[in-house]
């Protein structure tokens, strides 16, 4: 715990050396993660949102460190936030038995795997609707569009399969598949930047 605190303090100090906005972003991420660990681990969807905020904030932080926060950096933040929240919900389907015993109020625990899988699908669709925007705005090159299209198809395929069979086994399988589609999405971001 002491080591983690020291690292967090060091990170906050270094972010302040960059600029005030980076410090505020780092502080917000530290605050959200601390609150999650202390109070909100068992809150289900709210906890999912908090985890996803911390996962997605590096896109905003990177923009603040470079040229400043833009519409495209906010789009990437939202895409990662939405898709990671969907994955957290799917993790809840896979862990529903243990979560129920521990009193974790995930969507799967409260409303069942079928309902949770549909919410995850909806979040993926929202992220997918945003995905062409960086190309349309002229920030990303054609390689981005090709790779993000593959990732989008993967998200749709995996989430539809889960709706059809929202079992623990299928949720575990889907959770792993989602990591692959996310990795392809990351490649889309990298190659789209290089070949812009």
Language-model region placement:
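Intramembrane alpha-helical segments
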Residues: 1-71, 75
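Multi-pass membrane catalytic core of lipid/isoprenoid biosynthesis enzymes
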Residues: 1-27, 104-140
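Interhelical loop and helix-boundary elements at the membrane-water interface
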Residues: 1-3, 34-54, 99-118, 161-184
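Residues within membrane-spanning alpha-helices of integral membrane proteins
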Residues: 4-8, 26, 30, 48, ...
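Transmembrane alpha-helical segments that form the membrane-embedded catalytic/substrate-channel core
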Residues: 31-38, 57, 78-93, 150-162
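Alpha-helical transmembrane segments
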Residues: 71-83, 140-144
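Extended hydrophobic alpha-helices typical of membrane-associated regions
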Residues: 136-196
């Amino acid at each position: 715990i002491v080591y983690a605190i020291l690292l967090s303090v060091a990170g906050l100090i270094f972010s302040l050396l960059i600029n005030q906005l980076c410090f505020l972003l780092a502080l917000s991420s530290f605050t959200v993660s601390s609150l999650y660990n202390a109070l909100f681990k068992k809150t289900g969807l709210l906890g999912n949102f908090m985890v996803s905020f911390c996962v997605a904030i590096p896109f905003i932080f990177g923009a603040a460190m470079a040229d400043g926060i833009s519409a495209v950096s906010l789009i990437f933040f939202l895409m990662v936030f939405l898709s990671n929240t969907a994955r957290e919900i799917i993790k809840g389907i896979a862990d529903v038995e243990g979560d129920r015993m521990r009193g974790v109020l995930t969507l799967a625990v409260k409303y069942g795997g079928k309902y949770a899988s549909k919410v995850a699908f909806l979040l993926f669709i929202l992220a997918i609707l945003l995905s062409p925007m960086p190309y349309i705005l002229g920030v990303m090159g054609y390689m981005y569009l090709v790779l993000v299209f593959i990732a989008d198809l993967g998200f749709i395929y995996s989430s539809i399969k889960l709706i059809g069979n929202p079992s623990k086994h299928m949720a575990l399988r889907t959770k792993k598949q989602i990591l692959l589609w996310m990795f392809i999405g990351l490649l889309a971001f990298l190659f789209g930047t290089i070949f812009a």
